[in-house]
Curated annotation (Swiss-Prot):
Domain of life: Eukaryota
A matching Pfam family: STPPase_N
Subcellular location, principal: nucleus
Entry EC no(s): 3.1.3.16
Positions with a binding annotation for Mn(2+) 1: 70, 72, 98
Organism: Arabidopsis thaliana
Entry note: cofactor: Binds 2 manganese ions per subunit.
GO cellular component terms attached to this protein's record: nucleus; protein phosphatase type 1 complex
Keyword flag Iron-sulfur: no
Name this polypeptide is given: Serine/threonine-protein phosphatase PP1 isozyme 5
Subcellular location: Nucleus; Cytoplasm
Family: Belongs to the PPP phosphatase family. PP-1 subfamily.
Residues at which Mn(2+) 2 binds: 98, 130, 179, 254
Length: 312
């Protein structure tokens, strides 16, 4: 693979951007935002976009790797995740999408993730979530944050980058990872390789389902989804898919779970959620899943912190 990524961004500039974003851990009195300028953010978007397009839509990764679920602009919690799991390149990472919206610092969150993607393109991976889509993040906070802190044109630059994100990953041919879940159109995992990018997220079909579907204990086969988008699927569909594709586990995000992770279908599917105390409205923990070389999965838990102190 041509190293367009690092080669088209001055490493010293990139390191300085990462340093400033990480300095948020020790903020000076009164500074709550790690400010990058418009051109720096655009460069992160342009360079990472090229890397996403050079790498496949279905990533094929090797363990060990640490997997994270939804972050939703909770930047201080993203930094806590890295403190638990090790700041790159101390560990390999796979994030399952939903970096923006709802939280207060979507810009810091996505900028740090894109910067790490550029710096460590073969060790740091980002999948697309349903919120990495213009029609969704126009409504749930990211558009407003871009407009308030920069301008609408910058939001459009992010949209172009999000349209190039990969949508699924396979770890050592045995663990399938995506943001949402399975699809009635997905028979063979190889089909995901045929999704062409850049692309918006359609209202129905394989790409939509990979980003939007949910497992349900109340369904056998496929059911209606209360979200009004995609489907729900039963434990039978998880087992059927894994047998057909000779795989062991589906790892996905997309739903708040109380303990940060939750198994389904006799531990054949796990839901990961990595934004503790989500939106300040839930008392959920966040989790980080470590997959070792033998594909053993273990979990590190981020307990919710006191809401009153979390942004001070």
């Amino acid at each position: 693979m041509a190293q367009q990524g690092q080669g088209s961004m001055d490493p010293a500039v990139l390191d300085d951007i990462i340093r400033r974003l990480l300095d948020y851990r020790n903020p000076k009195a009164g500074t709550k935002q790690a400010m990058l300028n418009d051109s720096e953010i655009r460069q992160l978007c342009f360079v990472s976009r090229e890397i996403f397009l050079q790498q496949p839509c279905l990533l094929e990764l090797a363990a060990p790797v640490k997997i994270c679920g939804d972050i939703h602009g909770q930047y201080s919690d993203l930094l806590r995740l890295f403190e638990y799991g090790g700041f790159p390149p101390a560990a390999n990472y796979l994030f399952l999408g939903d970096y923006v919206d709802r939280g207060k610092q979507s810009l810091e969150t996505i900028c740090l993730l894109l910067a790490y993607k550029i710096k460590y393109p073969e060790n740091f991976f980002l999948l697309r979530g349903n919120h990495e889509c213009a029609s969704i993040n126009r409504i749930y906070g990211f558009y407003d944050e871009c407009k308030r802190r920069f301008n609408v044109k910058l939001w459009k630059v992010f949209t172009d980058t999000f349209n190039c994100l990969p949508v699924a990953a396979v770890i050592d041919e045995k663990i399938l990872c995506m943001h949402g879940g399975l699809s009635p159109e997905l028979i063979n995992v190889e089909q995901i390789k045929n999704i062409e990018r850049p692309t918006d997220v359609p209202d129905a079909g394989l790409l939509c389902d990979l980003l939007w579907s949910d497992p349900s204990k109340d369904v056998k086969g496929w059911g209606m989804n209360d979200r009004g988008v995609s489907y729900t699927f039963g434990a039978d569909k998880v087992a059927e898919f894994l047998i057909k594709n000779d795989m062991d586990l589906v790892c996905r995000a997309h739903q708040v779970v109380e303990d940060g992770y939750e198994f389904f279908a006799d531990r054949q599917l796990v839901t990961m959620f990595s934004a503790p105390n989500y939106c300040g409205e839930f008392d959920n923990a966040g989790a980080l899943m470590s997959v070792d070389e033998s594909l053993m999965c273990s979990f590190q838990i981020l307990k919710p912190v006191d809401r009153r102190s979390r942004f001070f």
